[in-house]
């Protein structure tokens, strides 16, 4: 039996955004690859449709353990997510000139169905979440 949860975090896998990404509607297929050492929480999400499109992503709970949100019904249905464990949530990291300048987009998490590997970028309530939350490593 394949452990979809472990595979998607430790191996290079292909994920698909059927509707594209906001700002990149032409980019549908991405490779998600662990970035750096195996113990790092970061991954690279590189477009297979446009080599100029790529992002550093991270599981938000590494830096914000209390981060939680309700996925709207339409997104849950579109991705066939019925249980929270059916999904992997990643947030886009913006690197700064200095490591302490890095930020993470908590407003627009990327939600991936662990089994089908279909994904979308959710847009949450801007009064509750920050598009440029500080990314301050804690013991990493």
Go through the PLM ranges and name each one.
Residues 70:
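Short aromatic/basic micro-patch
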Residues 1-66, 84-140:
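Long, compositionally biased stretches
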């Amino acid at each position: 039996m394949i452990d979809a949860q472990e595979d998607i975090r430790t191996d290079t896998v292909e994920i698909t955004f059927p509707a594209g990404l906001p700002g990149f509607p032409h980019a549908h297929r991405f490779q998600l690859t662990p970035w750096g050492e195996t113990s790092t929480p970061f991954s690279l999400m590189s477009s297979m449709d446009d080599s100029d499109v790529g992002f550093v992503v991270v599981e938000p709970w590494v830096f914000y353990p209390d981060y939680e949100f309700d996925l709207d019904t339409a997104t849950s249905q579109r991705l066939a997510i019925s249980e929270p464990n059916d999904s992997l949530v990643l947030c886009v990291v913006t690197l700064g000139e200095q490591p302490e300048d890095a930020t993470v987009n908590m407003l627009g998490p990327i939600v991936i169905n662990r089994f089908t590997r279909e994904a979308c970028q959710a847009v949450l309530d801007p009064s509750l979440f920050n598009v440029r939350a500080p990314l301050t490593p804690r013991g990493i």
